[in-house]
A protein has these predicted regions:
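Active-site neighborhoods and metal-handling regions in enzymes and metal-associated proteins
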Residues: 1-461
Length: 461
């Protein structure tokens, strides 16, 4: 994206500040993180900072006045350090390159920032920001209060910037959606590669095993060779019973013929995440029990997809998926009709949570669990259930609109238990796709990898 995109975003934020009474917004990029000794983790910018600037160097701050003026503080050019760490944009090039009105050496931050905040009604910053950011801002306010006898006023209010940024980021423009489609395409290709890899291994060595980390390596290779900068989150590659663990991380167990493999993985491309989950048979053929549960989950995702459209509530997809899953639990014998009742009773009692205990949908964007309010805060409270399924009173979930992006990810996770048919024990299944809300419904942008059981089996042959 060229600088005009970021200039437009900063102008929108400035309008939001004016509408809320004025002030100055302060956003710092992410700090560098030490791994050990003199080695740092690979650097990743703060998502909102990059959303407003397109600038991905560390040690940078952005201040935006309600009148629209943007000031960037960044590292200066340093030929000696650039030998070791690479080229820097530098202060002199920043205004023309990034479209900001002013640029300063970040070493001057504590002198420049108070001047930009002086006599402004409010300072806006993300209240969940790094503690160092809050401390820095409080120090600037103290500096300004010390100049009160000179007629200088410190901002009287501190306001949370995070909700304004979240609302902006929730609605994607055409450029953002194009990047997310490409990220989903790369990730879908990686999932397909992993399926083909397992199919080939078990064709040549039916009695052998594939380690989870071998499959993960196939994913990472495909991400990087197509230009993705990194995984969007640590990949979950779960063999057999490990698929019952929602955030499984070990990635060192063997996958054997007859077991399922659950992969939850997506790449990050140019600052945007993808998030795909597929569950497939290690040797390329579902057992009858595996396929029975798989078809239930796939039907639940179809119901969630049909419920994802403009004017629908964000939570509608979850309710639709739960109804299909609950009916499937009764039909398959996971739940006992005599004990648990019909589908409405199963939902009312939350008995389904024995096998499906997480939500179906979350926002997707620059972060894999992206920012954005899930509730419609302007509406009156309504009766609902909390995260554990207990009755609660809450705001209704917000209404979906074109340009929003969500995941749709129902699943079933079966642990050995009395009354649960043994043929289903230790099966874990999740199917997840990325959905762009359109004018008429939603577009699944991650279907470059098969999802139907027969298509998965065909790919692995």
């Amino acid at each position: 994206m060229d600088s005009t995109v970021y200039i437009g975003r900063r102008a929108r934020l400035a309008r939001c500040l004016r509408d809320a009474g004025g002030g100055v917004a302060v956003i710092a990029t992410a700090p560098e993180r030490n791994r050990n000794s003199d080695n740092d983790h690979p650097y990743r910018h703060d998502s909102s900072f990059h959303y407003l600037t397109g600038f991905d160097e560390p040690q940078a701050w952005l201040l935006i006045d309600a009148d629209g003026a943007a000031s960037l503080l960044c590292r200066p050019r340093d030929p000696a350090r650039e030998i070791w760490d690479g080229l820097r944009l530098g202060v002199d090039a920043a205004p023309a390159t990034l479209g900001v009105e002013r640029a300063f050496d970040v070493a001057e931050l504590d002198a420049v920032a108070p001047e930009l905040l002086a006599d402004r009604p409010a300072v806006w910053y993300p209240f969940g920001a790094d503690a160092g950011v809050r401390e820095r801002i409080h120090a600037w306010l103290a500096t300004l209060r010390g100049r009160a006898r000179s007629g200088v006023q410190a901002p009287a209010a501190q306001r949370d910037l995070a909700p304004l940024l979240a609302e902006m980021r929730l609605h994607k423009d055409a450029g953002e959606l194009a990047t997310m489609r490409r990220a989903a395409q790369i990730s879908a290709g990686a999932h397909a590669r992993a399926m083909r890899f397992c199919g080939e291994r078990f064709r040549t060595d039916p009695g052998g095993a594939v380690r989870e980390y071998e499959i993960e390596a196939e994913l990472l290779h495909e991400f990087r060779r197509h230009g993705a900068q990194s995984p969007a989150y640590p990949a979950i590659v779960a063999a057999g019973a490990n698929a019952r663990v929602l955030h499984y991380a070990a990635a060192d167990a063997p996958l054997r013929a007859g077991e399922l493999c659950l992969i939850d993985a997506g790449c990050e491309l140019d600052g945007y995440a993808s998030d795909i989950t597929r569950t497939f048979p290690a040797d390329g053929r579902f057992t009858p029990a595996q396929r029975e549960l798989y078809e239930i989950v796939l039907a639940a995702q179809a119901a969630a997809t049909a419920s994802t459209r403009p004017g629908a509530r964000q939570r509608d997809a979850h309710h639709a998926a739960v109804r299909v899953l609950a009916q499937g639990m009764l039909d398959s014998g996971l739940l006992d009709r005599n004990r648990d009742g019909d589908v409405d009773a199963v939902i009312a009692s939350t008995a389904y949570r024995q096998f499906y205990m997480h939500g179906t949908s979350h926002w997707l964007g620059r972060d894999v669990h992206d920012v954005g309010e899930y509730l419609s805060l302007a509406e009156a409270p309504c009766d609902t259930v909390d995260a554990t399924g207990r009755p609660a009173v809450s705001k209704p979930s917000r209404v979906l609109a074109p340009g929003m992006v969500v995941t749709l990810e129902p699943g079933l996770y079966v642990r050995p238990a009395a009354g649960v048919p043994e043929r289903f024990w230790n099966i874990g299944i999740r199917i997840e796709d990325d959905a762009v809300v359109t004018e008429t419904g939603c577009e699944l942008i991650s279907r470059g990898v098969p999802v139907a059981a027969a298509e998965i089996e065909a790919l692995m042959r």
